[in-house]
């Protein structure tokens, strides 16, 4: 739903009654989730200079064939790449620091033609989780994401072994 709202330029209220998966968009959801999420995006990019792509499929190509995901938003402001994830569910707040999902997206995006532009020459990578009414932000470096990628490659290869140790979770 956020993709449609952001790319259309229309007011969120124009989407009332629309369905996303099994969720009907109501004024209450706009007030409690969508508007706070858009305000968070404005706080991240107050000058409206960010270039961004929404809902981009990212993957590791030949490094890890078949390993991919879909980012909510990949962007760039100055020397900072941005990886943003919308969390609209109620319940447990998701922490952003060292968040494996966001680091996965950043590492995969760096190897994906359609998203790598946001990381080229970046000296910082900001991870953002927007979980209205909360916004959590963490700035890291391309070097940290490269280390995460190495850890991920080792974990995937270990999991592919015939007698791989199983883990709950």
Task: Pin down the residues of each PLM region.
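Metal-dependent nuclease catalytic cores that hydrolyze phosphodiester bonds in DNA/RNA
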Residues: 1-76, 80-81
